[in-house]
């Protein structure tokens, strides 16, 4: 890889790492050929992946790994345990080169029901394809041991390694061991338990291991109650602990669920008119063993249904999926042989769909953040396009102007106009207005005066007009602005921002008669509108306070006879406020304006 390419890759990876979510999940490192070279788990994806690229985290093997990374993928999950299980499944599937080099390839244990005449049940870390049944893997060892212990207490099973073939048993080759004498084994080795009876127990054990433990749970609960009734509290407590563990075992996770087998899960998230993101999860034997999110660039304004259909065909072909059930978020017009489409409303399937949606939304957000960092103008364009779409504007709102009034019972009435260009404050274009024609507290008349003055002047000076006017208020404010637009024969869209009782932006109004526009709170667009409203309020109220303060200062000194403008200016320059002049000693005031005037000032302020 040449130096320029290395620099591009480095910047690309930095962009991904800086936008990783601070959530549990797994991450995958890919080389330049697109091969997964490492899979890892993390409680906090951003912190963990960042550690590989920090200078202090550079042992030899890690340096080699980091030098090979050309791309990073990740999957968000809901818990650390889910991340452990998913990491294990993906390592087994992809066998990444650097997982072997960098860490012990830990295999989570499973429970094996051995394929033999009298099957043994035991934990193992090795999967041998000899017809035996395997259940797991288990990331939580206590749960696994609780299940094994439960099985041990419910069913007498052999634990020996003897070859219990019918011929060997008939030949009398074996003797019972200690397990028989302590009633842990029924003695099939000497013919004391038939294969039929033994296999009946094995069939029930397999049901437990599949997660069908409701009946066993009921038995444990009953046993716990019986022991408590017999005042055997210590034994009851032990059974209670087992009951709690089996109940924990029964609770299913989003990543591993013993009742879900061979299912595909798809979700989609659009990015305006440009593209759509699709997430694909493949569930095999209750575990996620495929996860992929990809982007479709729209060419012919395709619908979500059309894009999702394309995505389903593409992913099933790419991953050779033969799943007979596909979970989707909405109805789509597609028929596949022997395939059922499900839109889940509750339960484990609903959780899987939510997990897929979580991943596709996170992927979309991360892609947008990366793009906006590379091109800051892109964020502004996206927000302006959103406003255009939500309000059905004819053109992009490149310039937005917002008005607000401020007064206290009609005194010191002022107004302000803030200007946002390309979704950013343009402070050099902000304007303050003293209300000239309105007497008393009349917000509507004040708004009308200021809007008329601003746009009358803009017309006369041929200044650029805004693409959208926003009022800091509801329907009444919008109506007076509309009247001015009609009077000046201007066609500028008008929106209103209403506040709740706590003076927080609560809704966006548009149209005549004004209608509430459903913009999701806390979305980037809503935050922009909230910023505009907060900014015009701040600007107006600051101007109002300044004006009120100057009036109060002026009136206090103006009422003192014999004090001219030069004296007032000198005092305010030194002491900054009337309050400080009043608090100063006569000597301090005399040093500025002389003793005789100082006495007049002090007496005048004391009597004010």
From Swiss-Prot:
Gene Ontology CC annotations of this record: cytoplasm; excinuclease repair complex
Listed InterPro entries: GIY-YIG_endonuc (IPR000305), GIY-YIG_endonuc_sf (IPR035901), GIY-YIG_UvrC_Cho (IPR047296), RuvA_2-like (IPR010994), UVR_dom_sf (IPR036876), UvrABC_protein_C (IPR050066), UvrC (IPR004791), UvrC_RNase_H_dom (IPR001162)
Domain UVR: 214-249
Pfam families according to UniProt: GIY-YIG (PF01541), HHH_5 (PF14520), UvrC_RNaseH (PF22920), UvrC_RNaseH_dom (PF08459)
GO BP: nucleotide-excision repair; SOS response
Record GO terms (molecular function): DNA binding; excinuclease ABC activity
Keywords: Cytoplasm, DNA damage, DNA excision, DNA repair, Excision nuclease, SOS response
Cellular location(s): Cytoplasm
Residue runs in coiled coils: none
Main subcellular localisation: cytoplasm
Residues annotated as domain GIY-YIG: 22-100
PANTHER family, sorted: UVRABC SYSTEM PROTEIN C, UVRC/OXIDOREDUCTASE
NCBIfam families: uvrC
Subunit structure: Interacts with UvrB in an incision complex.
HAMAP family: UvrC (MF_00203)
Role according to the record: The UvrABC repair system catalyzes the recognition and processing of DNA lesions. UvrC both incises the 5' and 3' sides of the lesion. The N-terminal half is responsible for the 3' incision and the C-terminal half is responsible for the 5' incision.
Family: Belongs to the UvrC family.
Name of the protein this chain belongs to: UvrABC system protein C
Species: Bacteroides fragilis (strain ATCC 25285 / DSM 2151 / CCUG 4856 / JCM 11019 / LMG 10263 / NCTC 9343 / Onslow / VPI 2553 / EN-2)
């Amino acid at each position: 890889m040449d130096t320029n390419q290395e620099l591009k890759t480095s910047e690309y990876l930095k962009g991904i790492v800086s936008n990783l979510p601070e959530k549990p999940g797994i991450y995958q490192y890919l080389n330049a050929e697109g091969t997964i070279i490492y899979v890892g788990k993390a409680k906090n994806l951003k912190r963990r992946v960042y550690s590989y690229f920090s200078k202090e985290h550079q042992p030899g093997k890690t340096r080699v790994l980091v030098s090979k990374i050309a791309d990073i993928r990740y999957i968000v999950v809901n818990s650390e345990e889910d991340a452990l299980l998913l990491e294990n499944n993906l390592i087994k599937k992809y066998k990444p080169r650097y997982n072997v080099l960098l860490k012990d390839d830990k295999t989570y244990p499973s429970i094996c029901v051995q394929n033999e005449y009298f099957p043994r049940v035991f934990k193992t870390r090795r999967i041998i394809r000899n017809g035996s049944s395997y259940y797991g893997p288990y990331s939580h060892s206590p749960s696994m041991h609780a299940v094994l212990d439960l099985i041990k207490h419910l069913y007498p099973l052999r634990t020996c390694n003897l070859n219990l073939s019918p011929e060997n048993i008939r030949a009398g080759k074996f003797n019972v061991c200690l397990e028989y004498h302590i009633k842990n084994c029924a003695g099939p080795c000497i013919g004391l338990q038939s294969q039929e009876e033994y296999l009946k127990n094995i069939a029930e054990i397999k049901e437990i291991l599949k997660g069908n433990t409701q009946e066993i749970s009921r038995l444990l609960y009953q046993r716990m109650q019986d022991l408590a009734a017999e005042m055997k509290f210590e034994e009851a407590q032990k059974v209670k602990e087992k009951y709690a563990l089996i109940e924990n075992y029964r609770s299913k996770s989003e990543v591993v669920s013993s009742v879900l087998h061979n299912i595909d899960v798809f979700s989609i998230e659009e990015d305006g008119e440009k593209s759509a993101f699709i997430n694909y999860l493949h569930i095999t034997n209750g575990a996620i063993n495929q996860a992929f999110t990809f982007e479709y660039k729209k060419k012919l304004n395709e619908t979500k249904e059309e894009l999702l259909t394309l995505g389903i065909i593409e992913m099933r072909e790419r991953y050779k999926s033969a799943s007979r059930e596909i979970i989707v978020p909405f109805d789509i017009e597609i028929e596949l042989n022997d395939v059922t489409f499900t839109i889940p409303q509750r339960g484990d399937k609903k959780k899987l769909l939510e997990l897929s949606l979580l991943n596709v939304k996170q992927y979309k957000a991360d892609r947008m953040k990366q793009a906006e960092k590379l091109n800051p103008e892109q964020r502004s364009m996206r927000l302006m396009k959103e406003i255009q779409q939500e309000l059905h504007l004819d053109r992009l709102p490149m310039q937005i102007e917002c008005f607000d009034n401020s007064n206290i019972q009609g005194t010191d009435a002022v107004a302000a106009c803030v200007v946002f260009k390309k979704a950013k404050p343009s402070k050099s274009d902000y304007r303050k207005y003293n209300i000239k024609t309105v007497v008393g507290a009349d917000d509507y008349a004040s708004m009308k005066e200021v809007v008329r003055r601003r746009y009358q002047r803009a017309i006369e000076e041929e200044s650029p007009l805004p693409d959208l006017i926003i009022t800091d208020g509801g329907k009444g404010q919008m109506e007076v602005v509309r009247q001015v637009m009609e009077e000046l024969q201007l066609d500028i869209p008008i929106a209103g921002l209403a506040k709740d009782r706590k003076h927080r932006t609560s809704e966006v109004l548009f149209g005549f008669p004004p209608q509430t526009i459903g913009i999701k709170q806390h979305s980037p667009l809503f935050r922009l509108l909230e910023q505009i409203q907060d900014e015009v309020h701040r600007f107006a109220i600051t101007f109002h306070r300044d004006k009120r303060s100057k009036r109060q200062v002026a009136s206090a000194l103006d009422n003192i006879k014999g004090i001219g403008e030069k004296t007032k200016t000198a005092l305010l320059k030194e002491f900054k406020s009337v309050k400080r002049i009043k608090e100063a000693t006569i000597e301090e005031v005399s040093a500025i304006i002389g003793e005789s005037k100082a006495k007049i000032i002090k007496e005048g302020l004391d009597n004010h």
